[in-house]
């Protein structure tokens, strides 16, 4: 059963402006170490890499119905790759707690994430599915 759906569109130029203005302070506040390492491996597309991940965080916050309130912070939501290479989310802190609150008893969550970009836009969709254990 689908328990959450969220999407977000992020302007890559806006992320580039934040990187230019705030540098590592912005990176460390918003992105996980795994996300920062991936961006460093893509020096010519760093803003696009970050913009897709920023959009994913926003999309997840919409899918759980909180936005960035009620203890859900951007760094609690990390984009990682499954063994297949597909993007998914690793949750900690308030994001993990909020997802657990949404799950019916006897269910576990699967998070489906898709990312795309076409300069100057990056887009993410998140679907949260509950499966009976």
UniProtKB/Swiss-Prot annotation:
- Keyword Nucleotide-binding in record: no
Cofactor(s) needed for function: Mg(2+)
Q: Which domain of life is it from?
A: Bacteria
Positions of Mg(2+) binding: 8, 58
Pfam families for this protein: ACPS
Annotated InterPro entries = 4-PPantetheinyl_Trfase_dom, 4-PPantetheinyl_Trfase_dom_sf, ACPS, Ppantetheine-prot_Trfase_dom
Among the entry's GO cellular component annotations, what is one?
cytoplasm
Question: What positions belong to coiled-coil segments?
Answer: none
GO process annotations (BP): fatty acid biosynthetic process
Q: Which UniProt keywords apply?
A: Cytoplasm, Fatty acid biosynthesis, Fatty acid metabolism, Lipid biosynthesis, Lipid metabolism, Magnesium, Metal-binding, Transferase
Reactions catalysed: apo-[ACP] + CoA = holo-[ACP] + adenosine 3',5'-bisphosphate + H(+)
Q: Tell me which species this is from.
A: Erythrobacter litoralis (strain HTCC2594)
Family in the record: Belongs to the P-Pant transferase superfamily. AcpS family.
Does the keyword field hold tRNA processing? no
Instruction: Name the principal localization, coarsely classed.
Output: cytoplasm
Q: Where in the cell is it found?
A: Cytoplasm
Put simply, this protein is called: Holo-[acyl-carrier-protein] synthase
């Amino acid at each position: 059963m689908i328990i959450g759906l969220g999407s977000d569109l992020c302007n890559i130029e806006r992320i580039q402006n934040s990187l230019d203005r705030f540098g590592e302070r912005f990176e460390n506040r918003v992105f996980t170490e795994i996300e920062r390492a991936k961006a460093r491996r893509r020096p010519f597309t760093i803003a696009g890499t970050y913009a897709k991940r920023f959009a994913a965080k926003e999309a997840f916050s919409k899918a759980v119905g909180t936005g960035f309130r009620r203890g859900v912070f951007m760094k609690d939501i990390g984009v990682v790759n499954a063994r297949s290479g597909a993007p998914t989310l690793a949750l900690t802190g308030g994001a993990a707690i909020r997802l657990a609150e949404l799950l019916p008893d006897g269910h576990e969550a699967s998070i489906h994430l898709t990312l795309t970009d076409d300069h100057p836009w990056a887009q993410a969709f998140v679907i949260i599915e509950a499966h009976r254990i």
